[in-house]
UniProtKB/Swiss-Prot annotation:
It comes from Neisseria gonorrhoeae (strain ATCC 700825 / FA 1090). InterPro entries: Ribosomal_Su5_D2-typ_SF, Ribosomal_uS9, Ribosomal_uS9_bac/plastid, Ribosomal_uS9_CS, Ribsml_uS5_D2-typ_fold_subgr. PROSITE patterns: RIBOSOMAL_S9. Keywords: Ribonucleoprotein, Ribosomal protein. This is Small ribosomal subunit protein uS9. Pfam families: Ribosomal_S9. The keyword Iron-sulfur does not apply. The lineage of its organism: Bacteria, Pseudomonadati, Pseudomonadota, Betaproteobacteria, Neisseriales. Belongs to the universal ribosomal protein uS9 family. The gene is rpsI. One of its GO terms (biological process) is translation. GO terms for cellular component: cytosolic small ribosomal subunit.
């Protein structure tokens, strides 16, 4: 990665994304693969591009991402959060628009732990009256 780059760390569920942003042609590389190849679902690809589309930087910036942990939804959310933080590092004037869209806030929802005596976090064993 030559020249000036902007960095942002994004987190969502159990995923962590490290995002490097440089001036370029608009390509997004996730773990060495293009975003369209990395994510099977169209919604995941859309989530990743949301901050770029909102700030009208989709064609002017290249993005390189390293993402670990979690599944497709968590990883795409982590990448979106990381891209948002990198964009703020790139241009602080973008923060109000990104904040208004809700991209700056880290989604704090995590998986609830399984409790003893229950089948899942809240699901109890089936009760039989007779």
């Amino acid at each position: 990665m030559n020249g000036k780059y902007y960095y942002g760390t994004g987190r969502r569920k159990s995923s962590v994304a490290r995002v490097f942003l440089t001036k370029g042609t608009g390509q997004i590389i996730v773990n060495g693969r293009p975003v369209d190849e990395f994510f099977a679902r169209e919604t995941s690809r859309m989530v990743v591009r949301q901050p770029l589309v909102l700030t009208e930087n989709a064609e002017s910036l290249d993005i390189k991402v390293n993402v670990v942990g979690g599944g497709e939804t968590g990883q795409s959310g982590a990448i979106r959060h990381g891209i948002t933080r990198a964009l703020i590092d790139f241009d602080a004037a973008l923060k109000p628009a990104l904040s208004q869209a809700g991209f700056v806030t880290r989604d704090a929802r995590e998986v609830e732990r399984k409790k003893p005596g229950l089948r899942k976090a809240r699901r109890a064993k089936q009760f039989s009256k007779r």
